[in-house]
Curated annotation (Swiss-Prot):
Gene3D superfamilies: 2-enoyl-CoA Hydratase, Chain A, domain 1, Lyase 2-enoyl-coa Hydratase, Chain A, domain 2. InterPro entries: ClpP/crotonase-like_dom_sf (IPR029045), ECH/Chromodomain_protein (IPR051053), Enoyl-CoA_hydra/iso (IPR001753), Enoyl-CoA_hydra_C (IPR014748). One of its GO terms (molecular function) is isomerase activity. It is found in: Peroxisome. This is Uncharacterized protein B0272.4. The lineage of its organism: Eukaryota, Metazoa, Ecdysozoa, Nematoda, Chromadorea. The keyword Isomerase applies. Belongs to the enoyl-CoA hydratase/isomerase family. It holds the Pfam family ECH_1. One of its GO terms (cellular component) is peroxisome.
Length: 255
């Protein structure tokens, strides 16, 4: 069972996983990460599921990243057991294709997680931003490993060091996005692509992923995920980070 903020629907041999927190732009909470862990673990063991489609619910945002409200920040003290790190570990080891259907703006962890997914189909109005330097945090979800290899060092640095926002077209040129679809026909065109993929050999897709993401690469990614989390946890005690997060996410009290 999930909290209702994560929706799942099986369409033939495809599992659709949808973020369902539109009032908060689908920002991810600790509980949502834990729910995603359950959903993906179950999908990994289900022989009737060929691959997973990961997308956002209604609204202009695919996902606004992690929820950095004070209540959520307080859950980040235990790195090893936090749902966020556990979910990234699951994505790294997930044996079947994961297709990100980016149907709106993507921010923070929703961008960095794309590096451990297998295809990224984006609406042409989407933007991609990782404003780490704006709030005093660091790369996450193995992005310090994956994005320089996907985009090249300078493009990855523009995104993660200098808080540059990428359009869907720019992200496509950089290699982060696999395909761009026009907003006017996005849902119809995306469905056609997913329907075509659903008719492909699930065994071929699974074996191809296993051969591409070797045990050595998985181990490297797991190590990077742990290293990033250690750095991230340490940054939460820095005065600069505290000041930036407070200014961005904490509403001043009304006296």
């Amino acid at each position: 069972m999930t909290s209702g903020l994560i929706l799942t629907e099986r369409k033939n041999n495809v599992l659709w996983v949808t973020l369902n927190r539109p009032k908060k732009f689908n920002a991810l909470t600790r509980q949502m990460f834990l729910d995603l862990c359950t959903v993906f673990n179950d999908a990994a063991d289900d022989d009737d599921i060929a691959f997973v489609v990961f997308t956002g619910g209604k609204g202009k945002y695919y996902c606004a990243g992690s929820d950095f409200s004070p209540a959520e920040l307080s859950t980040l003290t235990d790195i090893q057991e936090h749902g966020y790190k556990l979910f990234v570990d699951i994505l790294i080891a997930f044996p079947k294709p994961i297709i990100a259907l980016v149907n709106g703006h993507a921010v923070g962890v929703s961008v960095t997680m794309l590096g451990v997914m297998d295809a990224v189909i984006a609406i042409d109005t989407a933007t991609f931003a990782t404003p780490f330097a704006d709030i005093g945090v660091c790369p996450e979800a193995c992005s310090s490993y994956t994005l320089p290899r996907i985009m090249g060092h300078q493009k990855a640095a523009a995104l993660m060091m200098f808080s540059e926002k990428f359009t869907a077209h720019e992200a496509h040129i950089a290699g982060l996005v696999t395909q761009i679809l026009p907003a006017a026909t996005f849902e119809k065109d995306a469905k056609k692509i997913i329907d075509r993929y659903s008719k492909l050999s699930p065994i071929t897709m699974k074996v191809a992923k296993e051969l591409m993401r070797t045990t050595q690469i998985k181990d490297e990614l797991l190590t990077v995920n742990r290293k990033e989390q250690v750095h991230l946890n340490g940054m939460f005690s820095h005065e600069d980070t505290i000041a930036r997060l407070t200014a961005k996410f904490v509403k001043p009290s009304k006296i």
